[in-house]
UniProtKB/Swiss-Prot annotation:
Gene that encodes it: RFT1
InterPro entries, alphabetized: RFT1 (IPR007594)
The UniProt record lists the keyword Endoplasmic reticulum: yes
Membrane-traversing stretches: 18-38, 42-62, 94-114, 126-146, 168-188, 203-223, 341-361, 389-409, 419-439, 491-511, 512-532
Name the record gives this protein: Man(5)GlcNAc(2)-PP-dolichol translocation protein RFT1
A Pfam family the protein falls into: Rft-1
Keyword Hydrolase part of the UniProt annotation: no
Topology within the bilayer: Multi-pass membrane protein
Organism this protein belongs to: Eremothecium gossypii (strain ATCC 10895 / CBS 109.51 / FGSC 9923 / NRRL Y-1056) (Yeast)
Keywords: Endoplasmic reticulum, Membrane, Sugar transport, Transmembrane, Transmembrane helix, Transport
Major place of residence: endoplasmic reticulum
Biological pathway: Protein modification; protein glycosylation
Family: Belongs to the RFT1 family.
């Protein structure tokens, strides 16, 4: 276990690297499989698999996300030992980690029945569709069963194991998904050259997706359990079932820490509205868009946010884990460390956002042409992805700022943020109605609504962080955040020049030569950014080196 702020920072820096590697492996495997399948399947099938994925992710989010955040607030002894305190902390975490199954099992059934009744009859009558629903429910239960062991490894900051296990689970999912479709196309449906039964083909594709979900969940559960038996069970630090723990400073025992339980309730309320805003676009397209448009948006989410999920998501999650563990003891030193980390990460995000905004819209359509088959040529996906590129920086910046807010905010501040989420939910729905129903902007209108939503959330978190910074440095001459970003002015000017030159000479990329010119320009810009932040990069390299911290 880590005890000092610098040790937690060092391990979290390594953890971000492990999570990025795991995400990179998982996304590369998924990417290759996606490019094979997209040439066989229609936008309609991607629409229904997107719905099943939404069903699974929604149940898992509402079941476990608040618990994962709340257990990070369990106060540690700080000595890094393995005595009674360590055992009590882990048992408390495991007790909380048993709650997701109690929430998820009934929620999965209710949500599946409700959504099933609202589906188009075309899908409900597909071969194997009912079996696919049952398999998705099974995958949810299997994944929730692994939650106690996930929480234990999260509490110990065991990033390496998690990235290894999740990488293996993703690989298993993709292999099963591909194997089922490949088997059907080559052994049942001819050689894949002629579609003899397109209706059954679509049913098989949905079934393959569901089987992939089950393979992922079962692999994850098996790996966590085997690791527990091999490395933790013999030490008897905790039980996987509910066990009472002695309340600190008291002779009484309880299953749940009262402070953590109160924080869980407030975080859960906030996450309900946060998820509605984060996943609200999927709810909207299910109501206001055609099945083909749902498939297009699913494709955009998969291709358009590759960088976001491979780079930004691991950093955001590592920051959240790092800050929550670090600030379980809110010393002045720890507060200064967390502020320094945030400023450096915001700089990195701003640099990457500039690169995406400059080169994303001009290159994305050309690159996407090589990745999709003829079944998508008649859709608007090539035009829509250009607009989607402008949304990615807002999505990413909001993620890092809200991760900081969730880590440092008190229970009452989180509750106030929940009320804001409630208000923004109404604003989001209003914007969607205006853009989609009134102006008929289709998917572009949905993206504009998301940009407005993310902008408002960024403004709120930025104001909170600005106040937090002023209070933290009240006794110092440095009371403004702007001085930390003074070096960005030169890079911003360079970005404007590069964007003007790129658009004036090339515009939208149409051939390989123009693509190579854009790559050269982007590399030059990135090198200029790296030179501008050379001291920060050297510090990051030092932090990424292995530290003598024992990992379980």
């Amino acid at each position: 276990m880590c005890s000092t702020g610098e040790e937690i920072l060092a391990k979290s820096t390594q953890g971000a690297t492990f999570l990025m590697m795991g995400q990179l492996f998982g996304k590369l495997v998924t990417f290759v499989l996606h490019n094979v399948l997209v040439r066989f399947l229609s936008p309609r099938i991607f629409g229904i698999t997107s719905f099943l994925d939404f069903l699974s992710s929604t149940v898992l989010f509402f079941s476990r996300e608040a618990i994962r955040l709340a257990t990070l607030r369990i106060k540690t002894g700080g000595d890094g030992g393995r005595g009674g305190e360590m055992s009590a902390e882990l048992q408390t975490a495991v007790n909380f980690a048993n709650i997701p199954m109690c929430i998820g099992a009934p929620l999965a059934v209710v949500l599946a029945v409700w959504q099933y009744s609202n589906l188009n009859s075309y899908f409900t009558q597909l071969p194997f569709f009912s079996w696919s629903i049952y398999l998705v429910l099974l995958s949810i239960l299997a994944e929730l069963a692994s939650e106690p062991l996930y929480v234990v490894n999260q509490f110990m900051l065991n990033y390496r194991k998690r990235s290894q296990f999740e990488g293996a689970a993703v690989a298993a999912s993709c292999l099963v998904n591909f194997a089922v479709i490949y088997w059907y196309e080559n052994w049942v449906n001819g050689r894949g050259e002629t579609v003899h039964d397109s209706y059954k083909q679509e049913g098989i594709a949905v079934l393959a997706f569901a089987l992939g979900k089950v393979a992922r969940a079962m692999t994850l559960l098996a790996l966590y359990y085997v690791d527990y038996v091999r490395h933790l069970a013999h030490e008897k630090l905790f039980s996987l079932s509910l066990t009472k723990v002695r309340v600190p400073g008291s002779v009484y025992t309880a299953y749940f820490d009262s402070d953590v339980l109160q924080h869980f309730k407030k975080v859960y309320f906030q996450l309900c509205f946060k998820h509605l805003l984060t996943e609200g676009d999927k709810l909207i397209i299910n109501s206001l868009c055609t099945v083909e448009e749902q498939g297009i948006y699913s494709l955009l989410s998969n291709y358009g946010s590759l960088i976001t999920r491979m780079v930004f998501a691991p950093i955001e999650e590592s920051l959240l884990l790092f800050l929550t563990r670090l600030l379980s003891d809110k010393t002045q030193q720890n507060l200064h460390i967390c502020m320094r980390v945030l400023v450096n990460l915001v700089k990195f995000y701003l640099y990457l956002a500039l690169v995406i905004v400059i080169f994303g819209p001009t290159n994305s359509s050309f690159l996407l042409k090589f990745l999709i088959g003829s079944k998508w040529s008649s859709t608007s996906v090539l035009e829509t992805i250009r607009v989607y590129c402008f949304y990615l920086p807002f999505l990413s910046m909001n993620g890092i700022l809200e991760a900081f807010f969730a880590s440092v905010a008190s229970g009452d501040e989180i509750l106030r943020h929940s009320y804001l989420m409630m208000l923004l939910s109404g604003v989001f729905l209003l914007n969607c109605w205006v853009f989609l129903a009134h102006f008929n902007l289709s998917l572009e209108g949905l993206i504009f609504s998301n940009i407005i939503n993310m902008t408002l959330r960024i403004i709120y978190c930025s104001n909170y962080i600005r106040g937090f910074y002023k209070r933290l440095f009240a006794d110092s001459k440095q009371t403004s955040l702007s001085s930390s970003f003074a070096g960005l002015k030169k890079i911003l000017l360079l970005c404007i020049v590069v964007a003007y030159v790129d658009w004036s000479i090339i515009g939208y990329v149409q051939n390989i030569r123009q693509l190579l010119v854009n790559i050269l320009l982007s590399v030059t810009l990135v090198l200029a950014m790296a030179y501008n932040e050379r001291k920060l990069l050297l510090e990051f390299i030092k932090k990424s080196k292995p530290v003598p911290v024992k990992e379980n």
